């Protein structure tokens, strides 16, 4: 019998992407506080957070296979989290305007006797944005729950000049790499 699969995330985008695999799974949100370790690189931080999220749920459900994930938007060595308010969202979008940044998504899969954690890094270039474009976007409320204050799968796509890497990773779950990793847990789509 296959072990139950759990997604340890409340992200509607991650749910949407995991649905593409057409596998039965449940959602149990991890209560891990998303604090960064200043001694870690962005890649180390995002992997550490994904692992903590998956482990927190796996510890409560030891007979399940648990997927945890985390995404960070990084510019000039600084990681941009979710904006706290509209002013911070505007500030983030001004910084991203006309520039390239990295989006790093880590996935951690935890099971009783096996675990796997990896990350995917994608480069995204933005067009130059006017103040009007920034504030019109913020008024949609779309940027308020997203790292870097934009969603590539929504109106934020209008800001993207070029993407080099996995689009789905920018959305929050590199689905192809995740499926390949799940094969190591005897799960196939």
Swiss-Prot record:
Function noted in UniProt: Nucleoside triphosphate pyrophosphatase that hydrolyzes dTTP and UTP. Can also hydrolyze CTP and the modified nucleotides pseudo-UTP, 5-methyl-CTP (m(5)CTP) and 5-methyl-UTP (m(5)UTP). May have a dual role in cell division arrest and in preventing the incorporation of modified nucleotides into cellular nucleic acids.
E.C. designation(s): 3.6.1.9
UniProt-recorded name of the protein: dTTP/UTP pyrophosphatase
Marked site positions, Important for substrate specificity: 13, 71, 153
Main location: cytoplasm
Disulfide bonds: 74-79
Disruption phenotype: Not essential for cell division.
């Amino acid at each position: 019998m296959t072990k139950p699969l759990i997604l340890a995330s409340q992200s509607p985008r991650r749910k949407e992407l995991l649905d593409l695999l057409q596998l039965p799974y449940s959602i149990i949100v991890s209560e891990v506080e998303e604090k960064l370790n200043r001694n870690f690189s962005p890649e180390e931080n995002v992997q550490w957070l994904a692992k903590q999220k998956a482990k927190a749920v796996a510890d409560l459900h030891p007979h399940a296979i648990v997927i945890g994930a985390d995404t960070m938007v990084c510019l000039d060595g600084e990681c941009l989290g979710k904006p706290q308010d509209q002013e911070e969202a505007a500030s983030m979008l001004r910084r991203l305007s006309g520039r390239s940044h990295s989006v790093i998504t880590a996935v951690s899969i935890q099971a009783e006797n096996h675990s796997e954690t990896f990350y995917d890094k994608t480069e995204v270039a933005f067009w130059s944005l006017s103040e009007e474009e920034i504030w019109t976007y913020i008024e949609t409320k779309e940027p308020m729950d997203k790292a870097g204050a934009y969603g590539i799968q929504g109106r934020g796509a209008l800001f993207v000049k070029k993407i080099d890497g996995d689009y789905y990773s920018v959305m929050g779950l590199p689905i192809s790499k995740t499926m390949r990793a799940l094969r190591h847990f005897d799960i196939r789509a």
